[in-house]
């Protein structure tokens, strides 16, 4: 699932492609991508609107229009796909060999911006304002923003009795972390993912804060170099494999102490950690 670094890389790559362009036409190929909204709402708000800015909030891509906005949420497998023109859109959308599962497409002044998801979990919504979007409006402090200070983070930790891993996944507390970077941050901070958030002392809290920022920044660099390939659904994961220290490394020796990385289940998700290093 794309997390903060991947979504930020998409935003930075999209800006020069779509910013300032007008949406000429909207194609909704699979209505499930806009539910519970109606396809007509998306079409009505977006058609003939100009994309003023491309921004990010947590794991959401925001296309700020001259009136209203569009939110793109990738969920597990959603991705942005770029087409040269309408002809390529329909050719690739209908191709069995090199096809993509396009749910929604926006024909722009130059090029076509598509939103694809083979599982149809991702969502594209139209809103008149940010406050109208319950998902975006409830998001907590962004993990790469200047507001995410060590002091702010410590206060959030102190107010929660949840296990650290579950706390980090709560987007209403800290926005942007998912399963991958929560595991990685806890490994770098040498903290047991099962510990209660409020149990961390001052030094441990600062260590985790530093690890989160460092892990996300390094991952973002990997996502941007080379630049995102909007034709490869797994572009974001390829470069990350070389920097991951815990995630998806069950049974492999810990890069610090040599003890095998373990996998446990927390909140229905896999957590990877070192039982010797992480206390």
Name every feature range the model reports, one short phrase each.
Residues 70-176, 181-188, 196:
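Phosphate/anion-contacting hairpin/loop surfaces
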Residues 1-4, 143, 147, 201-209:
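Generic detection of long, well-ordered alpha-helical segments
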